[in-house]
């Protein structure tokens, strides 16, 4: 196995802190192990876990790259033993365990997907993290079904814009919460039945009114904190609450009696630390059931902005501003 170069530029985290701690460094090009591909990165998605890692709150799993970046798109340039599907020269998009903010990145072949026809590298890099996360949490853990009500907090986030569209595509009725009127408009354009501006409306009361008092069946929550108890109040009987982040805190107090009386399911997950075989299963489901909707235009890839790799700090600054959709680094 050979690589194009011995060294590459990558964005390192030079200590805990603000975006300014993201700095270009020259490091060795990684080598693919068994079942892995070496990808020449053309674009890398920027996600909230990258920000959490920069702040020292979400360290890289043991044995994986400390370079941030959980999704990439690019061209295969080398492969390890046992790879079967993708070969040198193939273009792929991939969910990775880290290392995406770099010129080259190693990816498990089973977590790689073909890029949908007609999609460029920037769009492709905006797909894996959101689609894997939404499919696993909304449809597998949350069990969202046709005709059910789905509530998405953070409707214009990178996760939110995917969740709204996929839920609607599979026949659910969608409610989204956001923090401004223009974001409400964006959610409605993506297919939400109702958009709630949480700065001026109580989402619990709005959900109750929209569902005629029944509540929603599935909630995907990235907020945590005091939203958890309010989510429980917003769920219908046999409802499912799925937490994937906790921007307002992970320690909460809930009324278990309400959970018991309504027979609720409270669950959640993190994707980065899951075994490769779990991610492989999610990848196949995404490829079989979700990506065709991208190919036929039913689900759009929403990219807010793209920055050069050298401006990763500016991309993180953009994460803290009012944006709609994904932020991507061009490599």
What role is predicted for each listed range?
Residues 87, 125-201:
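Mid-domain Rossmann-like dinucleotide-binding core that forms the NAD(H)/NADP(H) cofactor-binding site
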Residues 52, 67, 85, 91-156:
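NAD(P)H dinucleotide-binding glycine-rich loop of Rossmann-like/cofactor-binding domains
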Residues 178, 226-298, 331:
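Glycine-rich phosphate-binding loop and adjacent beta-alpha segment
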Residues 91, 149, 173, 239-240, ...:
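Short glycine-centered segments of the SAM/dcSAM-binding site in methyltransferase folds
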Residues 2-6, 279-331:
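C-terminal hydrophobic helical "lid"/dimerization subdomain
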Residues 203-213:
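Short amphipathic alpha-helix with an adjacent loop that forms part of the alpha/beta core around
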Residues 28-45, 57-99:
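Glycine-rich beta-strand-centered segment in the early N-terminal region that forms part
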Residues 100-103, 178-186, 203, 251-256:
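Short, glycine/polar-rich helix-capping loops at beta-to-alpha or helix-loop-helix junctions
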